[in-house]
Amino acid sequence: MITTLRATAAAAAVAGIISQAWPASAETIPDDQAVRNVVLVHGAFVDGSGWRGVHDALVARGYAVTIVQIPLTSLADDVAATVRVLDRQPGPAILVGHSWGGTVITEAGVHPNVAGLVYVSALSPDAGENTAQQYEGHTTPPEFVIDAHGDGFGFLNPELFKAGFAADASDADAAFLRDSQVPIALSAFETRLENAAWRTKPSWAVIATEDKAFDQAMLQAMAARIGAIVTEVPASHAVFMTRPLEVAAVIDTAARSVSQQAQTSN
């Protein structure tokens, strides 16, 4: 199922989008909702602070939200950092990953505290696959260029950063992201996964329709393969920052859905 959130310049339309993202019935989560925890995993080239808008929207509605700071030094290190946070959750959680964070949650999501997965313009390899394989048969948009450093880490090309990563952010915000990049060990993209949590956990996907980090066909194909419920949002790859209400709404929907399923099965 695909939900599309369409933006227009009119204030009334903007208000409508916010209303659609957070219906009146979703002001706070019910006292008896089983899934009340959310764990957020950032992607490459950024850190966890970019989740602030999503964090605040979910906390306002009663969720306990934890943001993982993955080191981006290897898949194993990033998964270990995520598992460390999952171990601290007081109950079932929705695990969310953006971009490279999707690979991380795919591996870490087999943790028993994970009730569901949300992929935010994110990668979702299968067990035995690596991240680089997900690009096969697809063409990466020319705006997204990774500059390899001599020590094996990669940065996004600074001249193309805004166009490739955060085209819908303000010039100032995009410049700050560019200047505060966190490089990723490029070898991480070649590491094969041992687990694919989406094979046993329900999944949702946010697809940014103006994403220049991935080919749109690639995003759609990955979401279809994992059986994700898809929400399309008109945004750049930085959708988690530029459209936090829409992203938070999908996470909220996932938590409510998994909780309702648990109640029905009891």
Residue ranges of predicted features:
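Flexible "cap/lid" loop of the alpha/beta hydrolase fold
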Residues: 113-158, 185-192, 222, 263
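Gly/Ala-rich beta-loop-alpha elbow adjacent to hydrolase catalytic centers
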Residues: 96-101, 105
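Short beta-strand/loop motif that positions the catalytic acidic residue
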Residues: 205-207
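Catalytic active-site module of serine/aspartate enzymes centered on a nucleophile-bearing elbow/loop
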Residues: 231-266
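Conserved alpha/beta-hydrolase catalytic His-Asp/Glu region
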Residues: 152-197
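Conserved HGGG/HGGXW glycine-rich cap/lid loop of the alpha/beta-hydrolase fold
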Residues: 33-75
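Conserved loop-alpha-helix segment in the C-terminal half of the alpha/beta-hydrolase fold
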Residues: 209-235, 241, 254
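Active-site loop/oxyanion-hole signature of alpha/beta-hydrolase fold enzymes
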Residues: 60, 64-94, 108-111, 132-136
